[in-house]
Amino acid sequence: FITYISAIGGQAFGVWLLGLSVNNFSLVAGINACFFLVSASILFLGKSKLSLSLSSADGEILKNEKLSIKEQFLTIYRNLRLVFLKGGQKNFGFMIFAVLLINALGGALGSIYNIFFLSHSLLDFSYTEALFISQFCALLAIIISSLTGNDYFGKQSLPRLMMWVTVGLSLVGLANLFNQVVLGLLFICSTLYVSAKVQPKISALLLKNLAPEVLARTSNFLGLLFTLSIPVGTACFSLVAVWNIQLTWMLFVGLSLLAIFLTVINLKNDI
C-alpha cells in the first residue's frame, strides 16, 4: 500500500516537473536517474543491515546443492509445471505464455499513452494533466483491488481472471483505436482492477504446492520472467507508436486477441 501511495506522489511530482520544464523530457529523465542513484547508494551503504541469517538446516541445503545452471533451470521448470498441474492446468506452456503476453501488454500501456496523448486529448486537459489523470486512475484501481481481495473476482480461478483481463485489454485497444479516449481510460481502470488479482493467485498456488526450500527460488524465477516481459513489451510498442500510433493500437488488439485464444485453451482445462 505504501508503494502505491509513493507511486502516486512520484507521478504527481513528475507531471508537475514536466509541466514546469515545458515538456523537457531530458531534464525529467535525469532527475529520475538521480533518484535511482540515491536509492542505490542508500541500499549499498546499509547492505550490512539487510543480511539474512540462515538456519543450520538451510545452510546444509545450500552446501549440498551443487547443481549446474541447466539443472537448476530444469528443476525450476518441473516445479512450476507441477504447481500448475496441481492447480488444474494441463497446458502449462500456454498458461505461462499467456501470462507473459498479458504482462507485456499491460506494461506497455504507459509508454503507449505517453505518445498517444501527444496527439489526442483527454477531455481538453493538457498533456501533463492527461498523463497524471490516467496514471492516478490506474494506481487507484490497483489500490482498490488490493483492498478488496474477497470480492467476486478474488474468488475466481486463475484462467477466468486471465480471460477477464485479456478481454479488457482488447477493449482498451479498440476504444483507443476509434479515438474513444475516455472509454479507453475506463476500460484500463477496470482491467487493472482485475489484473491486480492475478499475481496473488499465482503466489497462492506456489505457496500451497511448493516446499519451503524451493519456494523462493521458483517464485523469484517466475517473477524474473514477468519483470523481463514488461521492458520487452514497452520497447516494441514504443518503437511502433513513434512511427504510427494507430498501427500500435491495431497490434495491441491483435496480441490481445491472441492472449484471449490462449486463455480460452486454459479455461477449457480449468478442472
Report each predicted region and the residues it spans.
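Helix-to-loop junctions at the C-terminal end of transmembrane segments
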Residues: L18, I144-S157, A241-V242
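Juxtamembrane intracellular "pre-TM" segments in multi-pass secondary transporters
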Residues: K49-M95
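C-terminal transmembrane helical hairpin of 12-TM major facilitator-type secondary transporters
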Residues: L158-Q199
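A single, central transmembrane helix in multi-pass transporters
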Residues: V22-L27, T75-I144
